[in-house]
Amino acid sequence: MTNGWIDIKNTDMMLIMGGNPAENHPCGFKWPVEAKLHRNAKLIVVDPRFTRTATQADLFLQIRAGTDIAFLGGLINYAIQTNRIAKDYLINYTNAAFIVKEGFKLPEDGLFSGFDGHTYAKDTWNYEEGGNVGPKTQSTTAGVAPTSPSTPSGKSSSETAGEQKKQGEQPAANFERKSEPVSSQPSTPQKGGDAMGQGHQAGGPVGAAGQGGQKPPPMLPANVSYDLSLQHPRSVFQLLKQQYSRYTPEMVERITGIPQDQFLKAAELFTSIRKDGDMKKAGTIIYAVGWTQHTFGTQIIRTAAILQLILGNVGRAGGGVNALRGHSNIQGATDMGGVFDIFPGYLKIPQPTDTDLATFNKRTTPTSSKPSEWDSYNYWSNTPKFMASFLKSLYGDSATKENDFNFHYLPKIDRKFSWTEMWDEMYSGKVKGLFAFGMNGVAIGPNSRKNIEALKKADFLVVCDLFPEETAEFWRAPGTTPEQMKSINTTVYRLPGAGFAEKDGTFVNSARWLQWKYVAVPPPGDAKVDQEILARIFLKVRELYQTQGGKFPDPILSLSWSYTTPLNPSLAEVAKEINGKALADLTLDTQPGVTIKAGQQLPGFAWLKDDGTTSCGNWLYSGSWTEAGAQMQRRGTEDPSGLGIYPNWGYSWPANRRVMYNRASCDLAGKPWDNERRQVWWNEMQGKWVGNDVPDFKVDSKPSDHMGPFIMNAEGVGRIFGPLAAFADGPFPEHYEPVESPIANPLHPQQSNNPVARKFTSDLDKLGTVDQGFNVVCTTYRLTEHYHYWTKNNPMNVQLVPEPFVEIPAQLANEMGITGGEKLKISSARGQYIGKAMVTKRIKPMMIDGKKTYQIGIPIHWGYRGIKEDEHETGLTPANLLSPAAIDPNAYTPEFKGFLVKIEKA
């Protein structure tokens, strides 16, 4: 989350899509209810099913699974055409005014510029080099006026842009310069400054080419060309406007199935917070895995971020783009590098070309890219400090400046090692073994049949879990005969683990809060806590290297393991190690008179060094366990601001700030957009930023410095346009159909799917079509009464919901003669799922591009091991036997939502 659970109570407007918090996050859902009760906030819910969350909505819209970008793109188009945008914010806090390189092409045919048939060359996905190319005398703000008097659903707001392009004309400018302020707060600094970049002369020639020789990798220009009037046809804003002019209410209806009048109600309601230029109100967007689990999931979230940027909702109390994490510690697992392509703190993994630490730092450390008159904190410029400190935490005294802090010990990945690709390589015989800790890979899927067959080809499998589950017992999957079992040569080791109540440690919630938890009961029998199991394995492996040698043992032998109890490290010790400590006496220019002595805990990541004098396991968590104690254990209930900040409860990364990018909660002069929800502000007397929250900003940067509020971006501003390699599939989001779809993409039928989505090609990776009889859209979901695949082993949960079912529309059931409770067989091109029919009016038929289309929903919580499974009272069919192994090219998440099935009576 950019904000946090409690902050939702501060909002005036909520859009919940891709999530069902009333059922899946019932404790957290109290905060949307608080906002409705105490702020009269409005709630819009968009979902394939009418859920418990939808019962609380002021407006509910049923959407076809996998069409969220079309809906959100329609909202962007509506906001622009009706002049409901945050004008000052847009110009000064986003890259809307930046000029994009000549040669960049929007995907009117489904492809951005640079596509070679397999991937994108991204040279044109960049900014133009230069200076101010707009009018030399510009006002602080730019007012928005529609390009024509037509309604948002009329031809001239969408088709005209395309006609202009066909005729070779420049798109009509959507902005006109105005001299009057557009918000109730002053929009220019009180002292010595204009709006960012105002009035400066143009810089060097736009688009100047480099000299001959080998073409270097494209980089962001140091001095970006810009136009504060936003009239330049290649300004990010004009390209944004052109991109989403195609997303008319008519097109939204064709793709999503949402009737135009209902879409316009949602668009009118959500953008009403910016009616008449008002900047006091804030709106939030809340989502969960219903957005992430698509072959374009990252771009769905990007579309929401763009919408929030043009509405000025990011960095503000009651605003943001807020992810509801699906497990209690998914956030912490990601923060600590629990995926293949990052280290803790979101540091990048080295590549084979990173021959030394300096080369790695040069590749991964961004340099500022902005108009020369603006300023950018560019906090990722500290990457060398973060990386050196991380290496010191790994290798201790053996990591020195002279040996690059043992950088050469790190693995250099030469291809993708995502979850789905790992299983694909196991199926092809390349991966020989798997350690599965608290992870039921067969049930999780996708394409569970392929995962089962992959495990049959492995040499060994180690499973640490609480119960017998599908992965540990893949060999007894339904359909496996005794003779086939005998032919399986995989050795399976089962290790009894400890449940969450049987071990201490931390949870990091969706709001980025680190909170310490204590042991309630000891693990039963031979069960052991995770760190003891991992420690025993590591120490035995190290012993084998010490006694028997082996290929390149140095990384294992040099690893620092200086815990008081090596066989069972204290997690308090580990937490302190992650926070970091000084390895020599430290001082900071910004904190004169303060010295951190060697051996002391670091007070925060500002103290990290690149010279080997600091050690830190995760720079984001630095400050969580200081000399003052375990900040994550704090339970202070003081909330002086009333905004739900609770600064003395736990620890929120980074730096205990609760709302990220909170400089954007103020105007250019440093005054809050809304004085009733004051987060941070500029204090002229003190010469620094102060507030109820920790300023997410360079604390002494004056408003007149024109420093952008988005300090983690090289540009210093929010990215409406995502340049270069920021995204694999386009600098703007575009609607693509799921890999299995009932229709061709109405925007560009010749390019229906994401052209760079990863699709697998083994004999078990089959895709279905409507012509093959797979004519129903299926989505998966979770129930309040169950927790993934654990609780099917708990009698109380099983009593509440004992067996799998299929949520089927009443109209479809009537057409097929299906009655409630009747057993159904749901088939995809990959497998079958057996469950009883739950005939419901919560899912209705939809008109998709003129064709009547049905959707169904199935919960994910069952398989072939569990209480009811062992009693043979279920179909023994995991839901992910149905789902396809096709993944998002950015986050590598499989497409568990929106695939095609057919329905038969079992």
Kindly label every feature range from the protein language model:
Residues 54-55, 59-277, 366, 374, ...:
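Long, well-ordered, tryptophan-enriched scaffold segments
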Residues 463-469, 473-476, 484, 522-538, ...:
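Phosphate/diphosphate-binding loops
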Residues 55-63, 472-474, 496, 513-524:
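Short beta-alpha connecting loops at secondary-structure transitions
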Residues 46-52, 466-469:
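Short, polar loop motifs at secondary-structure junctions
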Residues 532-586, 690-695, 699-702, 710-716, ...:
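Long, contiguous, secondary-structure-rich segments that constitute the structural scaffold
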Residues 92-96, 269-270, 288-290, 320-331, ...:
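A glycine-rich phosphate-binding loop feature that marks nucleotide/adenosyl-phosphate handling sites
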Residues 5, 490-495, 500-523, 860, ...:
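Glycine/threonine-rich phosphate-binding loop and adjacent beta-strand/alpha-helix elements that clamp
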Residues 1-34, 39-41, 145, 149-163, ...:
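Extended redox/cofactor-interaction regions of prokaryotic respiratory oxidoreductases
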